[in-house]
Amino acid sequence: IYTLSDGTKNIIDKLNQPITLKLYYAEKAAMKGPDKIRFFNIYYDFVKSLLEEYESVSDGMINLEVIDPRPYSEAETEALAHGLKKFPITEEENFFFGLVVQTQFGVEKTIPFFSPERQDFVEYDISYLIDTAITREKKKIGVVSSLPVTGQDVSDYMARMMRMQGQQPEPAW
């Protein structure tokens, strides 16, 4: 069992909608691959137990699905559609190891591949993914006008050059 950090628990506590964590791991493909790929079985067990801990402390707000994408299957097609990285092992088998976070409102965030170099940061990466999936993005607006509504955005150098020529940069309204 893995103990989650206080920051992760805070993110889980502020969940206002159920989310699904889809862990894609090509377990059968990994067994057919070279030793470097088989190493991922240990890393997979670590990530899976971590995600199970997320699920257990979430009061039913997190649903974990573990998916082994087999060749030419719907799961493999979904993994590719979500942007997960695939690594060919044999002519038939591809290796996948990634995560998709889905909200009930259709927001999807992805870790395309769990890199061993980021193993020390995997809890942070997952928590960040969940937080960005459930946090509404602020809307961005733009101003389109032929009038100098926002003023002239010029560098200090350009402002000096304009002053030398007797011109003044336009201030914002």
Task: Describe each model-derived feature in a short phrase.
Residues 1-173:
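Short, surface-exposed patches at the edges or C-terminal ends of soluble domains, predominantly
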